[in-house]
């Protein structure tokens, strides 16, 4: 079934949307009262799959070049992009793990270096307003370039990486086929970005939005109604249910005092990019697609479970204390946002070509960063 683009889709009947979101008009505080009818199981007739903004179904993945995608697929999974041949893009963004390195609170890079921030999912990244929690990369290409030279992530230099790739005949041929030239940093980052553009994960929520009412259970639809009613969609909107704005961590109630510990540079968020005081502690709102697979949550990995994340967000961002039943229903809805094609993405992974570095001349040391065949790719 072909999914309709978001500007033509509707998520709830207009009458229900009006009832559930009236408290959001003019940026007023969300109504903390839940309509009595939402306390009961919701029959199919109450929530027909006629859905409306601010939520939307996932649009089709953009058109891509198959040769560039195949090359990017291999590069994404190749540890030769790191300084010591041990870390790949997939090390922190594993497709069989929600596109993250769950359950790590923050990523671990080259030499066991512990990074300062939680790894966001790579799935559906194409539709995000910017890349990274602080939005420092405008494009997927810029995002792909950064970790390679980050000393706590992949710890390499692009010049050395390209030299390494030029020593692999299969890569030389693949770059020639895809780009009509030899390996370069621009070609490599574009290929990785082209691959990432294919990592869309439509699921049951999209089938619901396209008209298949029974794609969501009664409890999941009750959770959706609550999610909308209490104001979650003021930030988690659009086809990704997030990824389109930057919001302060602790909009209504202070977050960092509750968390405790030192406030780090990573905690400054968007401020690190813009240096604007108004951006202090602001972060890109994360997508909620596949959120059930990406624990722990928040930029610092503070919330260990999805239930705890929902409770903390309601408290700090909306000024609301949820009942256990409300939390349960919202979590049920969030679990329905997992993609139905995740296994297909995993099966489509292409292992990088194995190659042995050229043997050094007698008496000369081996090339720094050279890798053995078994080290060429992540499992």
Role assignments for model-derived ranges:
Residues 2-5, 10-12, 23-379:
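Periplasmic c-type cytochrome electron-transfer domains
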